[in-house]
Every structure is written in C-alpha cells, then in structure tokens.
Curated annotation (Swiss-Prot):
Obligatory cofactor(s): Zn(2+)
GO MF term (any one): metal ion binding
Quaternary structure note: Contains catalytic and regulatory chains.
Organism annotation: Wigglesworthia glossinidia brevipalpis
Spans traversing the lipid bilayer: none
Full protein name: Aspartate carbamoyltransferase regulatory chain
Keywords: Metal-binding, Pyrimidine biosynthesis, Zinc
Length: 153
C-alpha cells in the first residue's frame, strides 16, 4: 500500500482527534454525541484512505477533551477507533477504546412502550455481547436491542 505523507485534514492546536472511525460512521458519532452543538471548531474527514480499513472517517474537536468514559462510549459504533489528545499540535495521550459496561444519557430506547419515551429522556443501557454482536439492554424496560437500532434522544 502506498504511504500517505500529506495531511488530509488540517492539524489542530489542541483538543481531541478521533481516528480510525469506520467509513460512514463519523457523521453518526457527531450527531449521537451532540458534538454539533458545541461552539468549538470541528474538522472532519470522510472516506479517507486508510492502510488498516481501506477507508475511514476522522473527527477533530478543537478545544474539547474527552474523558476516558466518554471516549469508551464511542467503541459501540467505532471499536477500532483511537482517541488522541492534542496539545500544541502534538499528541500527548493516545487511547485505545474499551467497550463500556454502561451507557448513560446519550441514546433513546427503541421500545415505544418504554417509560423513557413517556418521560422524553435518554435511557441508560447495559452493554452486552452475544455471539460477537453488541447489544444494549435498556435499564427501564429491560429489553435487549442490537446497538445499530438504538438512536439518539
């Protein structure tokens, strides 16, 4: 594979870079994690060339630092992503993601009869793996859902 020696997306002075997001997932992450509501600059690369994945998405959040729990919640949709903290254009911390045990306050339960729908609030989910697939169990209605059908609030 050829080496790519030119930045496809402009570097940031400080903040967070989320790299190795599967292609076509970057916009979903922006929406799910409500980063579109920040007043800080967001730079994205979609369908960028990648040696590991053929194509990838990339998100750069200027002046935004994710804590470990926030970063690990990304692994539901981007398990191979890395989260890099940047300071003065230099990576000061690189985090490989781990699947969290619980996801709080981000996603909405797909069950129309769930009490979280009546209260118009985000549900809390317990993360489970069955047959190498990720499922989310709603803490309110106790139903399991494939992670791909659980949506933002």
């Amino acid at each position: 594979m050829p080496q790519y020696n030119k930045l496809q997306v402009e570097a940031i002075f400080g903040g967070t870079v989320i790299d190795h997001i599967p292609a076509q997932v970057g916009l979903k992450l922006l929406s799910l994690f409500k980063w579109l509501h920040t007043k800080e600059r967001i730079t994205m690369g979609l369908n960028l060339p990648s040696n590991q994945q053929k194509k990838k998405d990339l998100i750069k959040l200027e002046n935004v630092l994710l804590n470990e729990d926030q970063a690990n919640q990304l692994s539901i949709y981007a398990p191979l992503a890395t989260v890099n903290q940047i300071k003065n254009y230099i990576v000061i911390k690189k985090q490989k993601l781990k699947l969290p045990k619980i996801i709080n306050g981000i996603l909405s339960c797909p069950n129309e009869n769930c009490i979280s729908k009546v209260e118009l609030k985000a549900a809390d989910f317990i993360v489970k793996i069955k047959l190498n697939k990720i499922y989310l169990k709603c803490k309110y209605c106790e139903r399991d859902f494939d992670h791909k059908i659980v949506t933002k609030i």
